[in-house]
Amino acid sequence: MTETPNTSSEEIQTSEPSPDNELQVLQQENANLKAELQEQNDRYLMALAEAENSRKRLQKERTEMMQYAVENALMDFLPPIESMEKALGFASQTSEEVKNWAIGFQMILQQFKQIFEEKGVVEYSSKGELFNPYLHEAVEIEETTTIPEGTILEEFTKGYKIGDRPIRVAKVKVAKLPAKGNSDSNEEKE
């Protein structure tokens, strides 16, 4: 005797997916894969942007480090250059032989100044200007009523900058109005 299966043809049809169900499943899988692909693409683009930003940041840092290194090296040359300028200022008051030597030193000084210029270092003058703490260091204050307060009366050391950024501020003497108590007592003495 042979056994017949207990399943009917209706049951077989329900266990097999219908074409509509299969289409829905495939569409859902397709949508999931598209979403996953978009997510992976977004991650890739973010990683690419981060890498580009890192590259730019490192390049900027490298450029700044080089600029600061150049500035520091140039700053070391400022005192000897200024000493040479002062010495050359006295050369005109000496013998012909010293004057001839001074011409050679003047040429050397010009070469230094040319290097500074090529590197963007600019000397700025301060006398007669208004005091700016970003560009000046007040090392002396003189009370006066004839010159507006904050005006620079004398420059002890020159200031130098690259672009708008000072690499060495000028050391200066600044005018200040006398305190009211001081001006009254000065008038009484006269």
UniProtKB/Swiss-Prot annotation:
Domain of life where this protein originates: Bacteria
UniProt keywords, alphabetically: Chaperone, Cytoplasm, Stress response
GO cellular component: cytoplasm
Claim: Chaperone is one of the keywords in the record: yes
Spans annotated as Disordered: 1-21
Compartment(s) where it occurs, according to its Swiss-Prot or TrEMBL record: Cytoplasm
Effect of mutating residue 80 to S: In strain: E/UW-5/Cx
Ranges of compositional bias, category Polar residues: 1-18
Gene Ontology biological process terms from the UniProt entry: protein folding
GO function terms (MF aspect): adenyl-nucleotide exchange factor activity; protein homodimerization activity; protein-folding chaperone binding; unfolded protein binding
Keyword Cell inner membrane set for record: no
InterPro entries: GrpE, GrpE_coiled_coil, GrpE_head
UniProt cross-references to Pfam families, sorted A to Z: GrpE
Protein name from the UniProt record: Protein GrpE
